[in-house]
Amino acid sequence: MKKHYLWMLAAILTFCGPMAFTSCLHVDNSIVKPVKKDYFTRWNSCEALSALQDYVKDVTNPASTNFIKQEDRIVTFDMDGTFIGELYPTYFEYNLLEYRVLEDAAYKNSAPEDVREAAQAIRDFVREGKKLPDHFDMIHAQAAAKAYAGMTLAEFDAYVKAYASKQANGFRGMTYGQSFYKPMLQVFEYLEANGFTNYVVSGSDRFICRALVESIGIEPNRVIGMDVRLRSTNQGLEAGVNYTMGKEENLIRTDELIIKNLKTNKVLQITQEIGKVPVLSFGNSSGDCAMHNFCLSNPTYKSAAFMLIADDEARDHANREKALSLGNQWREAGYHVISMRDDFKTIYGNGVEKTEDSDGRPGVQR
């Protein structure tokens, strides 16, 4: 009898294999509790993080009166200075234009005078601390439209990525393309894990943004930015409504600026492209206030807005006094404030060191 029992047990194990104690013996796996992931290993305990976690816990709880349906969990992130560095010592796209016009042998001798003046203004600001001209955001946008005109989208994407592979000015151990704020990448991951959809809404060129955020998994259709008009290869000056693009044609950039995606333009673009009011918004400057206010005016759902302040002079090229003043301004506006100095355990990750600029630039702060 004992031998018969052992033979039957052996047969069960042989037949069921590794599933013997699950499928064959019907063990209830629902009693096994999943391990909770700590999404914020690069953060210190702080008010802003607690506010974010409390908010997410509330609006994702089906029993809460503040519950938000998953399809309406829309989050908008500014890019420069919000989750990628902008203080080395200026925006990536400004650095790129300076390089394109003043250093790129394939283009610099053919640059129009107004484009050259814009690039030189950036260089004078970076190297000598000279003030940029008033309304330089628009001056730059118009110059950039001209500087990259004629490039196919694939060519421009490759151009941006090639420059992004260069050593980031003012740092050791990091390229421009690696200069993400590591704690903010954890925010992206945390929100996605809780059913939110993250969008990048930047003042920088849409196709620059797409090239930079590709490495962190942001899909191109979730990127909104400055736009120039596109044309197909053989379209010429013919209006798109009158021209049929051929199968062998590519899309190319033109020198016509459509929109600089700052301030209220961000709200207009969000409305046109996403079609929903965000419930969370992240930014770092006055160019993001309209987007934040739009979020906080959400007529249907509880919402929240967060502003980063660049107050860490030890690990980044920051102006603490200016940052603290802005922090007070943002709090008064009803935004949660994230201190890069106090709230981030790291900014760019291990092995990255702030330095004097490798080419002798003084790293002047705005």
Where are the predicted features?
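Bacterial N-terminal signal peptides that target proteins for export
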Residues: M1-L9
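Electropositive phosphate-/nucleotide-binding environments in soluble metabolic enzymes
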Residues: C46, G150, T264
